[in-house]
Amino acid sequence: MKFKLIIVMAEDGLTDQAIEIARGHGATGSTVITSARGEGLNPIQSFLGLTITGQRDMILFLVEEHRSRDILEAVSSACCFDVNPGTGVAFQIDIEDAIGLRGQIENIQQEISKEDL
């Protein structure tokens, strides 16, 4: 079974929504890293030397490759990444190998079997 890692950088107010949408589209878990920071096309403005930005979260989803594109697009659409600039970004990368996913793999295999019926 092959996996992809979906990485979502989003405003902290969108974290729960992104997780809920991803789970609804087949993600079996997530990892959230809080207080992430990024910079886009335009540098972040500062006031008296202090950077003024909202908190961002990095959300990681290790998902089965056949579901990855659907999850990626669903999260992006629900969080309006293409509609509201600066809201967040989502992308995926290939995973060479992963260990410690036995329970999730069994769950994914059962779901795939149900879909085939």
Task: Outline where the language-model segments fall.
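Positively charged, small/polar-rich N-terminal and surface patches that mediate targeting and assembly
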Residues: 1-117
